[in-house]
Amino acid sequence: MTPTPRVPNDGVVRIFRGKGGRGGKAVSVVHGLPRRDLAAVAKDLKKHCGSGGTVKDGAVEIQGDQREKIAERLRAQGYVVKLAGG
């Protein structure tokens, strides 16, 4: 299992690709969103990407490597987005 990346609280939304503990399947993990927005953003991203996802440990997880789609969607909503990690 890969450890959760430490994310600074600087107002930037970071999107990681992870697959640890998921049988080798990739997920896109979105850190840095305000807690009050997590559920609504997760629902919107799942619909936009056409895949499943969840809110876990203060982050949104979307199934598959959807980082580009997620970044595009969040930028359109006014977030400052950075692709991070592999």
PLM features: residue spans?
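Long, charged, low-complexity intrinsically disordered regions
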Residues: M1-K43, K47-H48, T54-K56, E68-G86
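A generic structural motif
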Residues: G58-G64
